[in-house]
Amino acid sequence: MKPAARRRARECAVQALYSWQLSQNDIADVEYQFLAEQDVKDVDVLYFRELLAGVATNTAYLDGLMKPYLSRLLEELGQVEKAVLRIALYELSKRSDVPYKVAINEAIELAKSFGAEDSHKFVNGVLDKAAPVIRPNKK
């Protein structure tokens, strides 16, 4: 798949995870509804599905990775920032094929696109601290 299709998968995953976090619906239902309602022809759908399932299954683990580096309580984070960080931390911890810098840069771009003003700076700050611990060899 093209890098653009992966980027689109991440963008869709942020939107679907945002919905999941707010609704507390089953992730499979969120996925089904998202795919039924959105145009996903330029999306790496397999990667989108993996991100959704991976984040949903590993939420407590991913939250534990970010908590030491948050400047506020996890509960005080915006839902978009939480979704973006969870995706990046999933990629850093579970997808060694995704380069270190790609995971961070994609998260920054997602935060710029979907997050509040300056949320990309917050996301970058958290990942700059967490990533070297998750991947000490920076690969």
Swiss-Prot record:
Q: Which Pfam families match?
A: NusB
Q: Which GO terms describe its molecular function?
A: RNA binding
Instruction: Return the InterPro entries for the record.
Output: NusB-like_sf, NusB_fam, NusB_RsmB_TIM44
Q: Alphabetically, which GO biological process terms does the record hold? A: DNA-templated transcription termination; regulation of DNA-templated transcription elongation; ribosome biogenesis; transcription antitermination
The record's section on HAMAP family has: NusB (MF_00073)
Subunit comment for this entry? Monomer in solution. Forms a heterodimer with the ribosomal protein S10. The rRNA transcription and antitermination complex (rrnTAC) consists of RNAP, NusA, NusB, NusE (rpsJ), NusG, SubB, ribosomal protein S4, DNA and precursor rRNA; S4 is more flexible than other subunits.
Q: What does this protein do?
A: Part of the processive rRNA transcription and antitermination complex (rrnTAC). The complex forms an RNA-chaperone ring around the RNA exit tunnel of RNA polymerase (RNAP). It supports rapid transcription and antitermination of rRNA operons, cotranscriptional rRNA folding, and annealing of distal rRNA regions to allow correct ribosome biogenesis. Involved in transcription antitermination. Required for transcription of ribosomal RNA (rRNA) genes. Binds specifically to the boxA antiterminator sequence of the ribosomal RNA (rrn) operons.
- The protein's name is Transcription antitermination protein NusB
Q: Which gene encodes it?
A: nusB
